[in-house]
């Protein structure tokens, strides 16, 4: 998604195009790589998932592999923000854990925004 490009090179258009070219050449055009969410923010992807009733309780993002999610790694922060911006609690968290996760996410984003000013 859009927020990952600077951090992860496999989220760039260039990577997708190169991978797609290799796939097309290697499979005689039988396999194509699509990346429909490249221009979307995570909260936009979350909104679409909510509209399609994606079972988010069955999805996992935490880089530390924790269950419930750690709420501290970068992907958890983005996931928390995505659900928060959509006015929905991430089903991976209890009500109490969600309050703490949102508070931490807001602190992290505030600190980040202060650094980039």
Where do the model's predicted regions map?
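Nucleotide-activated chemistry modules centered on ATP-dependent adenylation/adenylyltransferase
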Residues: 1-117
